[in-house]
Amino acid sequence: LPTTWRPGPPLGCSAGNRMMQSPPITQEITVEEMERYKQATAEMCANLQVCGFDSLLFHFGHSIPVAQFLSPLTDRRTDQYGGSTENRCRYLVEILDACREATRGRMTFEVRMSATEFAEGGIDLEEGIRIASILQDHCDIIQASCGMITEKYMTWTHPCQHMGYHPNLWLAEAFKKSGKIHKPVTAVGGLESLQAAEDAIAEGKCDFFAVARQLIADPETIKKAIDGRADDVVPCIKCMRCHDSTVYGHHFQCSVNPTAGLENSIAHLVQPVERVKK
């Protein structure tokens, strides 16, 4: 939640929550401040629509501040926004509805959420399915991520080399098999290959597979696939250099794509190869 509107501690769903990996420092946001944030978000969506965007991803997962409303571990409010699953979903539903109205229903909304936080007292898979079943009526796609951005639980949020490929696919599959989710479900995290995504979709485990790091490793991944050159795709090795390089204040870096983060500054130095790949 924004911290620039007022001095003092950052605002959170409840007092004493962590902001990502910070100490427990948040101050409980008031209903009036929640309304301001909701309207600002709706205005932002309308502006993005004017700029030409036709789809938006709402990040309601990983225990980032706004996502903390969903979890019984971090939502300790005693008003209409705390307690039951429905109450904990209420504010995010209001945000989605306000954004839908601001964009006149002409944008696709995808909601990213933690299907489970893996934390004791937090969202488990059963609760994640209940939350998704509520949010789905206010968006178009549900993305089944997991974990929390804290030292103990972010391993699943950003799966790295030692976890194997697409370790969180089972969560999207659980959503699909629950019989309670009627909107398309996106899987995310550590994709092995485009063929693996095709197989997961064909087997009914998910409807989409979201990628981010793969497009850093090879920005032409999708184009190569369309052109029938999937074997030429440079795979992401899940080393987390892209994540760590920015966290520690370096320019954006990738272990398998040396041009990542430097595209504009070194474009004039990259010359066509003299001999093309056979």
Regions found by a protein language model. Give the residues of each.
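Flavin-dependent oxidoreductase catalytic cores
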Residues: 1-278
